[in-house]
């Protein structure tokens, strides 16, 4: 069983069932429970060229409102697959629950899930995305994506920050933390407290030159705390 909470609008969202024998059922629940109409279509992918964009005129759309159950009893094998599409005139939230069972056992319309089933979802832009066994994207072609793992693969809401975090190993994070500590302690904190070395310390810690001309300038702060300079004037 595979459940997906998603948002639909005028751009069709598609889900594909492959390498599985029917029947399977699809429960569509409008969230929250409203009766606003939406349209769905189920078609054999043999009738659609997946290497090019499908058009509405080639698909038989059915209008529905509220919650509904859609039952398909056809055979789905290695050479045949089904495509479930759903869209709405206005943007709304829906829950899609796809369930199926291998035909080697007795099935009902309320079939249970099968471990061998594979589902897929396309992006609203119909960009093709392919995933390997670790759900890593390794292919970028034209339209539909295929998932090699169970359940629905939908990478639309994946945060870009989480993608960055996943690419960093523990050692890399330690190195980043060490660099941040070095910059704070040696480059910022040390300069803030000053030092006797005029090349790294504060400008007010430069040695006072004991010449008459120095009286025409503002005395540095170090003068106030240096006994030698206090007595020199």
From Swiss-Prot:
Annotated membrane topology is: Single-pass membrane protein
Q: Give me the segments passing through the membrane.
A: 168-188
Which portions of the sequence form the region Disordered?
102-132
Glycoprotein among keywords: yes
Q: Where is the composition biased (Low complexity)?
A: 102-124
Q: Name one GO cellular component term.
A: membrane
Identify the keywords attached in UniProt to this record, alphabetized: Glycoprotein, Membrane, Transmembrane, Transmembrane helix
Q: Source organism's superkingdom?
A: Viruses
Q: Where in the cell is it found?
A: Membrane
Glycosylation is annotated at: 58, 77, 93, 102, 110, 120, 155
Q: Does the keyword Transmembrane apply?
A: yes
- What family classification does the UniProt entry report for this protein? Belongs to the ascovirus HvAv ORF58 family.
Protein name per its UniProtKB record: Uncharacterized protein ORF149
Which species? Trichoplusia ni ascovirus 2c (TnAV-2c)
């Amino acid at each position: 069983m595979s459940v997906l909470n998603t948002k639909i609008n005028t751009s069709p969202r598609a889900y594909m069932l492959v390498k599985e024998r029917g029947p399977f059922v699809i429960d569509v629940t409008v969230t929250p429970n409203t009766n606003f109409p939406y349209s769905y279509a189920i078609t054999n992918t043999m009738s659609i060229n997946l290497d090019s964009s499908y058009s509405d005129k080639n698909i038989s759309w059915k209008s529905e409102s509220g919650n509904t159950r859609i039952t398909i009893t056809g055979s789905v094998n290695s050479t045949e697959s089904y495509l479930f599409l759903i869209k709405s005139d206005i943007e709304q939230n829906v829950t899609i629950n796809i369930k199926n069972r291998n035909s080697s056992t007795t099935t009902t319309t309320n079939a249970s899930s099968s471990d061998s089933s594979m589902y897929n979802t396309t992006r609203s832009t119909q960009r093709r995305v392919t995933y390997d066994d670790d759900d890593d994207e390794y292919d970028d072609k034209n339209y539909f994506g295929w998932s090699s793992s169970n359940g629905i693969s939908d990478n639309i809401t994946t945060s870009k920050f989480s993608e960055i975090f996943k690419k960093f190993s523990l050692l890399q994070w330690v190195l980043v933390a060490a660099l941040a500590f070095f910059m704070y302690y040696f480059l910022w904190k040390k300069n803030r407290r000053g030092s006797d070395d005029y090349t790294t310390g504060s400008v007010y810690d430069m040695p006072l030159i004991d010449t008459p001309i120095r009286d025409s300038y503002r005395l540095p702060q170090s003068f106030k705390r240096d006994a030698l300079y206090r007595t020199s004037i």
